[in-house]
Amino acid sequence: MRSFLLASLASVATLKSAQAHPAHSTRGLSKRGIDLDSYRLKQPVSYTNANDVGSDASISSLTRRATAEETASELVKKVVPGATFRVADNYVGSNGVAHVYFKQTANGLDVDNGDFNVNVGRDGTVFSFGNSFYTGDIPTAPSKSKRDTIEPAAAFKSAVSVLDLPVSAGSATSEPKEAENTFAIKQSEGTVSEPEARLVYVQTNGKLALTWRVETDVLSNWLLTYVDAIDGSQVHAVVDYSADASYQVYPWGINDPTEGERTIVVDPFDKQASEFGWHSDGSKTYDTTRGNNGVAQNNWANKSASEYLNLPRPVSTDLKFHYPYSLNETDFQKYSNASVTQLFYTSNVYHDLLHKLGFNEQAGNFEINNNGAGGAGNDFVFLNAQDGSDFNNANFATPPDGQAARMRMYMWNGTTPFRDCSFDASVIIHEYTHGLSNRLTGGPANSNCLNVLESGGMGEGWSDFYAIATHLKAGDTRETDYPMAPWVSGKPNGIRNYLYSTDINVNPQTYIYVDPQTRVHPIGNIWAGMLYEVLWNLIDKHGKNDAGTPDFDSNGLPTDGKYLAMKIVMEGMALQPCNPNFVSARDAIVDADKILTGGDNKCEIWKGFAKRGLGKDAKYDRVARTESYDLPEGVCA
């Protein structure tokens, strides 16, 4: 493997904390007066944890079948008798647990928000499962002899009109695609890729509505809009693959320019996670910031996705990406190559770290060539530095496995000179973690599983949590408080409502603080605060590894509390149901520890959640949550 020198903007070993868009973020459609939060899906979701499965004789005694998929199918038939469904995805995690994902169908059409995930243990028995299947009356099938629905092009026009999309749709027509009941939308302008309409059902207000699922990528928002297929006048729900954020960066372990100096790092790639290195996809080697995991470039000109591969990026025939950068430079385009290099470096380091922790090809990670390791492939990340489409933010769009993701890093103009968030590792980590949480929750093939308000907020929380965890310093203790994005925002206390702290006087937020929230970032601040408590409980028990990568025991588990917490939380994402809430996600994390360690850390995990009101009797209600500060009997015995 050819070696190369990479000038990272410090020694990128410990990414900092924040990432997510600030509370004052101006998201694409928000600037047009459209509140996408009001269109979020609201279907009920349940999660049956390992303890509940074990205490239910009818489930625990379920006969093991020849394969995990067959065992999981029998469970679905038992839990939801009479339901029709298809296998949407499945894989076996690095811990031996099989994850099988089902999509509900009705009259031969998908129920787009009807999901059932079954986690099958290494012994072949059901470990836990999540369920959002519809159980009401199935409507009469639409007529095949005559169309009872509006035309797909009309649904597209309705979506454009209702959401005030920056798209020209007046001349739009539709053409059938190979997939049944799926149409390509032609003769429109303003989208990144060709729009598509597919006939599906969606659960809404306790019923199934027949809808056209209209897919439109308008760059700032990559949308699935569910337009009523009968009258075309109502939009039942909207899913947005994009997740916004904004923050700072330099070398792994240096979060931003306030923490250290730039240095040259030689061959930093992990040979197992990136077997082709960072500048090859296994079939071709590149002399620029392009490889199997991502391609980084400058997009100040705000070019569309079809032009990404032609955007300017640094070129070095000897792979020495060494470029000047000055904090005093007012013309940020003069250090464009340094910005692109930093973004490429930090994203690749994080890709490799997540791979070591279990976010691999089968689980839906981001690579062009999966090299026979499973998963869909063809989906690295487009990494746009100094993106010209916005200021004071960052953005990550996560389509399903097999489609390339997109990260856009903006300039921040709250200081003089402006600050470039590609030099803030916490922003990059926050954004990339949106890809992690979206690919794991509900399975790699389903990117619609963090779109209810609470689960969407938790997505922001996971992104903050991983940014904070990777930022911890050698001298930090549980008394150390962390802001989100203080450097890039120019605000010492960062951009969240409260610092991340185990001190209830510094951060008083508990479970009921979620009740009045109507936006995802305040909810994420609460969820990440709970995870911060769990993190320090595990560090106090197992110690803290301050190296850039974890050490593993003979069972493949991190030996320290920091990386173990990251591993357990990641495993919880894979276990939890599509669109979880705080309670079901907590249960999935407890279950994750049970899978990984046999429950060795249940006391520390429960104490962390119970301290913030998410104890054993906490109950979810959309407007009136019930707090609990009690521990389950015997967990700390």
Curated annotation (Swiss-Prot):
Record text on cofactor binding: Binds 1 zinc ion per subunit.
The protein's superkingdom reads Eukaryota
Record keyword Nucleotide-binding present: no
Q: Where in the cell is it found?
A: Secreted
Q: Where is the signal peptide?
A: 1-20
Q: What induces it?
A: Expression is controlled by the prtT transcription factor.
From the UniProt record, give one GO term of the biological process aspect: proteolysis
A Pfam match is FTP
Q: Which SUPFAM superfamilies match?
A: Metalloproteases ('zincins'), catalytic domain (SSF55486)
Propeptide stretches are 21-244
Q: Does the keyword Ligase apply?
A: no
Q: Which residues are glycosylated?
A: 302, 328, 337, 413
Q: Which EC number(s) are documented for this chain?
A: 3.4.24.-
Give the binding site residues for Zn(2+).
430, 434
GO cellular component labels: extracellular region
Active-site residue numbers: 431
Entry GO MF terms: metalloendopeptidase activity; zinc ion binding
InterPro entries membership: FTP_domain (IPR011096), Fungal_virulence_M36 (IPR050371), Peptidase_M36 (IPR001842), Peptidase_M4/M1_CTD_sf (IPR027268)
UniProt keyword terms in alphabetical order:
Glycoprotein, Hydrolase, Metal-binding, Metalloprotease, Protease, Secreted, Signal, Zinc, Zymogen
Its required cofactor(s), as named, are: Zn(2+)
Q: What does this protein do?
A: Secreted metalloproteinase that allows assimilation of proteinaceous substrates.
Q: What family is this protein classified in? A: Belongs to the peptidase M36 family.
Record protein name field: Extracellular metalloproteinase 2
| Organism of provenance | Phaeosphaeria nodorum (strain SN15 / ATCC MYA-4574 / FGSC 10173)
